[in-house]
From Swiss-Prot:
Location(s), subcellular: Early endosome membrane; Recycling endosome membrane; Cell projection, Axon; Cell projection, Dendrite
Organism: Rattus norvegicus (Rat)
Subunit relationships: Interacts with GRIP1, GRIP2 and AMPA receptors. Interacts (via C-terminus) with MAPK8/JNK1 and with MAP3K1/MEKK1; the interaction promotes MAP3K1-mediated phosphorylation of MAPK8. Interacts (via N-terminus) with RAB4A (in GTP-bound form). Interacts (via C-terminus) with STX12.
Encoding gene per record: Gripap1
Site residues, Cleavage: D594, G595
Classification lineage: Eukaryota, Metazoa, Chordata, Craniata, Vertebrata
A GO term for molecular function: ionotropic glutamate receptor binding
Modified residues (N-acetylalanine): A2
GO term, biological process aspect, one: negative regulation of protein localization
UniProt protein name: GRIP1-associated protein 1
Length: 837
């Protein structure tokens, strides 16, 4: 059993140790690969961060600065347009006010003329001529009536005196006083009729002037109402434009502030992320440095342990068990180191997942930034639409201003027509004055005669006429006051018109500025459209390139997937083989456990037999001593001894011991027979330590005690070996479980890893690892190439070390097998101390 332990268990331990070493090397290689992948991913993340920061800076500098400049330029252009429109409106208002002042002065002149016509001022030539004309017309009509009445009366008087002279024959001297007596009364009537006709004519003229004045004032009031309505509309449009301008300015300012706030927030977030990434990189670098130190320390420890093992194996064979224990301890340490490496690997995988998540977050943030850019473009389109609406409003204002200009031209034409009509009136008045002068020259003579009578009649009528004139003057004053109130109202309206003229000028200035801004915006729109077309072309080119790259990457990934599937199939096959070997090992362990239990039972039975034999031997020794004493006392030396030996040989206790020792399969007699038949050492340590031929009479008490002591020592060694066997079985079971778990971890890691480790048929592990490193390293990075070369050199050194270690382990295993064989063959000299000495 000891030989089975030494060969099978140590062979199995050797294979397990080799497998553990290979797994350790594979895990270290995978750790290096993970480190390389992690460094490449960190470099990629750093490169992506740099590119992202550059793109963000470029976007923020170009777009936000351009938008701010565009908004500021739009603001300046709008302000310039407003100023120009205000100036134009002021100019138009000033021109309208000048024309309105001219109209007011003309109205005042017309009112003065009307007043002079009403008052009949003699200082003015025109009104004096009009008064004379009226008076002469009235006098002419009155004289015509008087002439007709006098002719009728004269005809009657002429007929009546002729009849009287014929009938009575009186002299004509008496008739003259009768005919001339009513002459003063006729003159008075003539004057009265003249005054009445003159008043009628004056009243008709006053009514005509009042009607014309009222028509003119109503027309002016209508024009003023129209102008006021137009000015109100223009003022409302101006207020609306002002509010729109303020809203646009506020919106642009708010947008600029929001863009600045977003920019600051983005910068803070980027700084925080960069700091976090730097901290993580520092922590990862520290962990990598610690892992490297640990790996170097473990390598040194392993090398020292191997050297110590070699020294111990070469120095003493008895230290083989201690070396086995050291190997087991080293195995446990390797397990712990493997567990630590697995934990480190899980931590690295978690770090890789974190980096991937950060990469996805960065991609999502890029998408978010693109969405913000699209929103800004939409806002730009909204601003362009608002600008177009403002341009439409400006066009409407221009149309309104053109309508106002047309109305102004119509007013000017009406004023010119009024002037022409006034000039025509003046010409007619001049003609009438000439006619009146001619009539005056004709009727002067008649007036000279009639004036005397008229003056007499005027004395009586003047009082009544003065009363009527006072009434007329009072009416005229009331009308003048009314006209003055109307003039005040018209002046107030003219002031309002001046204010409206200013607003119209301002609006015209705004319209001009808006026209300029319109041209500028059209140019900017063309430039923006050209830039957008260029950007679309560039984006299409980049999209084509990205698609091509994506297709190439997809092909590469498909190849990698195929290779990984092949590797997975190979790993599955290997796993099936490992599972089979593990099941075989478990079956062997069960067999060994069962065999050990059987051996323990056999050993316990042998112990019982030996104890019983010991008890019988003690009894026999007591009997022998008694017999010896009896023989000594009876002086029977030789014959007694021979009888004692013969009696002992034929004693029932001896036969009983032989019969009892035959209970177990490995009995004392069988061992003696095997030793006598062959020189091969016994394979069981549970056999009896008595290897001498049956000469119990020659054994002393000291030899029996020594034999029992040796038996106890061999039993203790057996127990120690059983404990070691149990420990090795437990360790082999735990190692099998570790192997299953690690194979599952390796399979999951191979499934999750993205590294192309495709190994062509017939290639070695070294070429496959070189291809993996070449796939990991990009052709453009010189630093990565140097790193790749260093890793390849380190890998070659490690492989050479592994080969030497394999050779050393084989030598050690052979030495351990030899020492175990020697240890198994060592109980024979222990059982015969005389020969060994």
């Amino acid at each position: 059993m000891a030989q089975a332990l030494s060969e099978e268990e140590f062979q199995r331990m050797q294979t397990q140790l080799l497998e553990l070493r290979t797994n350790n090397y594979q895990l270290s290689d995978e750790l290096r690969k993970n480190g390389v992948e992690l460094s490449s991913l960190r470099q990629k993340v750093a490169y992506l961060d740099k590119e992202f920061s550059k793109a963000q800076k470029a976007l923020s500098k170009s777009k936000k600065a351009q938008e701010v400049e565009v908004l500021l330029s739009e603001k300046e252009m709008l302000q310039a347009k407003l100023h120009s429109q205000e100036e134009d409106f002021r100019l138009q208002n000033s021109t309208l006010m000048a024309e309105f002042s001219k109209l007011c002065s003309q109205l005042e002149q017309l009112e003065l003329e009307n007043r002079q016509l009403k008052e009949g001022v003699p200082g003015a030539a025109g009104p004096h001529v009009d008064g004379e004309l009226l008076r002469l017309q009235a006098e002419n009509t009155a004289l015509q009536k008087n002439m007709a009445a006098l002719q009728e009366r004269y005809g009657k008087e002429a007929v009546r005196p002729s009849a009287v002279s014929e009938g009575q024959g009186d002299p004509p001297g008496d008739v003259l006083p009768i005919s001339l007596s009513p002459m003063p009364l006729a003159e008075v009537e003539l004057k009265w009729e003249m005054e009445r006709e003159e008043k009628k004519l004056l009243w008709e003229q006053l009514q005509g002037l009042e009607s014309s004045k009222q028509a003119e004032t109503s027309r002016l009031q209508e024009e003023l109402a129209k102008l006021s309505e137009k000015l109100k509309k223009k003022q409302e449009s101006f207020c609306r434009l002002q509010t729109e301008k303020e809203t646009l300015f506020n919106d642009s300012r708010n947008k600029i502030e929001e863009l600045q706030q977003r920019k600051e927030a983005d910068l803070k977030a980027q700084l925080a992320r960069t700091q976090k990434l730097q901290q993580e990189l520092e922590a990862a670098n520290q962990s990598l440095a610690e892992l490297r130190d640990q790996r170097q320390g473990e390598r040194l420890e392993h090398a020292a342990a191997l050297r110590a093992l070699q020294d111990q194996v070469s120095s003493q064979s008895a230290d083989a068990q201690e070396q086995v224990e050291g190997l087991l301890a080293e195995n446990n340490a390797l397990r712990t180191s493997l567990a630590a490496l697995e934990q480190i690997q899980t931590a690295k995988t978690q770090e890789l997942n974190m980096l991937r998540e950060q990469n996805t977050e960065l991609a999502a943030e890029l998408k978010h930034r693109q969405a913000d850019y699209e929103e800004l473009m939409g806002q730009k389109d909204d601003l362009n639409s608002q600008l177009q609406e403002s341009l439409r409003a400006n066009s409407r204002l221009l149309e309104q201003l053109q309508e106002m200009g047309q109305e102004k031209e119509q007013l000017i034409q009406d004023l010119q027509e009024a002037r022409k009509s006034a000039e025509k009136r003046k010409v007619m008045l001049d003609e009438l004055a000439m006619e009146t002068l001619q009539e005056k020259s004709q009727h002067k003579e008649e007036l000279g005669a009639v004036r005397l009578r008229h003056e007499k009649e005027m004395l009586g009528v003047r009082a009544r006429y003065e009363r009527e004139l006072r009434e007329l003057h009072e009416d005229k004053k009331r009308q003048e006051e009314e006209l003055r109130g109307q003039i005040r109202e018209e002046k107030a309206r003219t002031r309002e018109l001046e204010n409206l003229q200013h607003t119209v000028e301002e609006l015209q200035a705004q319209v001009h500025s808006m026209d300029g801004a319109k041209g500028w915006f059209e140019r900017r729109l063309k430039e923006a459209e050209e830039s957008l077309l260029q950007q679309e072309q560039e984006q299409e080119e980049t999209l084509k390139q990205c698609r091509e790259q994506h297709a190439a990457e997809l092909k590469g990934k498909e190849e990698e997937l195929q290779n990984v599937r092949d590797q997975l199939q190979q790993a599955q096959e290997e796993r099936d083989g490992h599972v089979k070997t593990i099941s075989n090992l478990k079956q062997e362990v069960k067999d060994t456990v069962d065999g050990q239990r059987i051996l323990e039972k056999k050993g316990s039975a042998v112990l019982k037999d030996l104890k019983r034999q010991l008890h019988l031997e003690r009894k026999r020794a007591d009997k022998l001593q008694e017999r010896l004493q009896e023989i000594l006392t009876n002086s029977k030396s030789r014959t007694g001894l021979e009888e004692l030996v013969l009696s002992e040989m034929n004693s029932p206790s001896r036969t009983q011991t032989g019969d009892s020792s035959s209970v177990s399969s490995f009995s004392y007699r069988e061992i003696l027979k095997e030793k006598e038949s062959s020189a091969i050492p016994a394979r069981s340590l549970s056999s009896s330590p008595q290897a001498q031929p049956p000469r119990p009479a020659e054994l002393s008490d000291e030899e029996v005690a020594e034999l029992f002591q040796r038996l106890a020592e061999t039993q203790q060694e057996k127990w120690m070996l059983e404990e070691k066997v149990k420990h090795l079985e437990v360790s082999s079971a735990s190692m099998a479980e570790d192997l299953c778990r690690k194979s599952a971890i390796i399979e999951t890691y191979v499934m999750d890893s993205r590294i192309d480790v495709s190994v062509a048929a017939g290639h070695t592990d070294r070429s496959g690892l070189g291809s993996v490193l070449r796939d990991l390293v990009k052709p453009g990075d010189e630093n990565l190439r140097e790193m790749n070369k260093k890793l390849q050199n380190m890998l070659e050194e490690q492989l050479t070390k592994n080969m030497h270690l394999h050779k050393d382990m084989e030598v050690l295993s052979q030495e351990i097998v030899r020492l175990s064989k020697e240890c198994v063959g060592s109980p024979d000299p222990d059982l015969e101390p005389g020969e060994a000495n």
